A protein has these predicted regions:
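Catalytic cores of Mg2+-dependent Asp-rich isoprenoid enzymes
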Residues: 2-285, 290, 294-411
């Protein structure tokens, strides 16, 4: 197979959004995305020998300042994949250390919930979090990913990938052309790195080196990680969602897939855990969306379903203003909160189905987001005045209560 999918049988669908594609078109779109691969020919001359690299890693590990520094231990390798058949243990340890440091610096509440997992699961969660964080940062423009040897947005493969998506969907980006092309190219090469986690190669990006070990240990399906990248790509084309079903599909990609990967790492036996993990992601993402309505509207993004807003007489343009005392908003937010609570209740059913040693992590995350939702509800949906978050005291108190419940009581 070539490194990008053959697009000769694609067709042009003028103006079709992804939600309007029929099943065959949708299947073709996913084939194009999932066919992104990296080949052995991508290896270029490495500027340092394996033995020299191994000599440097102990110094790198010893010199890390876990409070301020985040240093890629393999930044000096000028090739996208490791040329040896196996990755030396020292390199793998450095890759996991990098992911854990990134998680400690960026994850906040999430990292706290990871700390009490068994070591192998904690390391895996940090590797997966690092993957998710980088994908999100690329989509938001907060991070510029590097793929050695590529030409960025002008790279022939990246251009072929972009054109294949546009031919199939007819979608036009909501971003300016240079920004759109740059972000999509980065996500394309991010998919290439992901492919190394599931083939015989190993990326020289520490995140994907650790991720390769993680998905192998815990049998994580690639489709969940591909779906998350697809969700980030959706943000390049869509800044409005007509129906709740449209919003649900987006939430599934960027959040439910996270829950589905987490339960593979946490361990479960009952197949119902899969459905509850899906609801877990929907609950957390919908809470985020409601909390960030005003901020997103200021960036010309409205994730709330337009048909539901219209039913309450609310125009998208009003969301960037102040609806705190508006009865229309009170009615809409109460209805939206009720939906979120439904998914929250389903998500809580996941906890008894997980390995007991892993329950604290998801329980803490659910509790933090549940508390944020309660704050919004108590304020009659007023997300327009002040940032809604938990204080440090609230976090510590809540975490202690959840830990005690998981440690000393049966669910």
């Amino acid at each position: 197979m070539s490194e990008t999918a053959n697009i000769g049988d694609s067709h042009i669908f003028d103006g079709a959004s992804e939600s309007e594609l029929n099943s065959n078109q949708q299947e073709r779109l996913e084939q194009i995305r999932s066919a992104v691969e990296i080949s052995r020919e991508a290896v270029k001359a490495v500027s340092i020998t394996a033995i020299d690299l191994l000599k440097e890693i102990p110094a790198f590990m010893a010199g890390l300042d876990f409070e301020t520094e985040l240093v890629n231990p393999f930044a000096h390798i000028e090739a996208p994949i490791w040329e040896e058949e196996t990755v030396p243990q020292e390199m793998m340890e450095a890759a996991y250390a990098y992911c854990e440091l990134l998680t400690r610096k960026e994850a906040g509440n999430f990292y706290h919930s990871f700390k009490y997992l068994p070591d192998e699961q904690r390391k895996a969660m940090c590797a997966y979090y690092a993957f998710c964080r980088r994908a999100d940062d690329i989509a938001d423009g907060d991070y510029v990913d590097v793929f050695p040897g590529s030409e960025g947005a002008q790279d022939p493969e990246a251009k072929e990938y972009r054109e294949s998506l546009e031919l199939l969907t007819g979608d036009k980006s909501v971003l300016d052309a240079p920004t759109y092309r740059d972000k999509l190219a980065q996500l394309f090469f991010f998919r290439k790195k992901l492919s190394t986690a599931y083939n015989c190669h190993a990326s020289t990006d520490p995140i994907f080196m650790a991720l390769k070990d993680t998905v192998s240990r815990f049998n994580v399906p690639r489709e969940h990680l591909d779906d998350l990248i697809s969700g980030m790509e959706d943000d390049l084309y869509t800044n409005r969602y007509r129906t709740f079903d449209d919003l649900y599909k987006y939430c599934y990609r960027v959040a439910s897939t996270v829950g589905l990967v987490c339960i593979e790492i946490y361990d479960y036996d009952d197949p119902m855990a899969v459905k509850y993990a899906e609801s877990w992601g929907i609950f957390m993402q919908m809470t985020n969306i409601l909390r960030d309505v005003a901020e997103d509207a200021g960036r010309n993004r409205v994730y709330l379903p337009l048909e539901d807003l219209e039913r309450h007489g609310i125009k998208p343009s009003e969301l960037s203003g102040d609806l705190a005392n508006d009865k229309r908003w009170h009615a809409f937010s109460a209805e939206f909160i009720e939906k979120i609570e439904t998914y929250h209740k389903r998500a809580l059913k996941l906890l008894p189905l997980l390995n007991r040693k892993a329950r604290y992590s998801p329980a803490a995350m659910m509790a933090f987001y549940g508390s944020i939702l309660k704050k919004i509800k108590k304020r009659d949906g007023n997300i327009f005045h002040g940032q809604i978050k938990l204080s440090k005291v609230e976090k510590v108190t809540l975490a202690a209560a959840i830990y005690a419940k998981q440690r000393f009581f049966r669910l």
